């Protein structure tokens, strides 16, 4: 029996309050993508930067329609910073290495799409997906042999691409940038999926049910 993680109760309460107060907004000038995590190889951040660069290089009209926030630190930090400078995307891709929990919540609120481009099975679940989804954000993730593509489902709560598929990731970024209806629909579905499967209450209930079954010798 698999018991998935539950989203932190404080984060869920914050998301509930924010969504309740959120009013309809006019069309944004640009779509904000967000990555949260350690800047290490298996997270696939370099792939994300390459996909972003490839997309705006082939379709320059999209450059002013999208931005990317990278929240986190790690051993690849210097290399990733240099890549962004070399591609001239310093005004579209932004690094945030020291972020408080309160600031992280604001990043979740302000982003339009969350991206988890992990390329190795080391990414077993991707709890950050759930944290973004509870704020009604669609997810772009990768088809790893782990829990990652199970959390956010392709075509329902977001888009799933093959690990290390730069072109596929670029096309997913494009789709989410130009298709507002898709973002809205998948964002709503993402929120609903977390409420149904990934609350702390759900996790505790499944844990209780499992122990009860074991005690009974099931």
State what each model feature region is:
Residues 1-18:
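Donor nucleotide-sugar binding/catalytic pocket of nucleotide-sugar-dependent glycosyltransferases
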Residues 25-54:
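Conserved donor-binding/catalytic core segment of Leloir-type glycosyltransferases
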Residues 78-99:
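Nucleotide-activated donor-binding/catalytic signature segment of Leloir-type glycosyltransferases, i.e.
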Residues 98-99, 106-111:
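Short alpha-helical donor nucleotide-sugar binding micro-motif in glycosyltransferases
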Residues 109-124, 137:
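Acidic donor-binding loop of glycosyltransferase active sites
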Residues 134, 138-142:
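Short hydrophobic beta-strand element within catalytic cores of glycosyltransferases
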Residues 153-155, 159-166, 175-181:
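Conserved acidic donor-binding segment of nucleotide-sugar-dependent glycosyltransferases
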Residues 168, 175, 182-197, 206-209, ...:
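A short, well-ordered alpha-helix in the C-terminal region of glycosyltransferases
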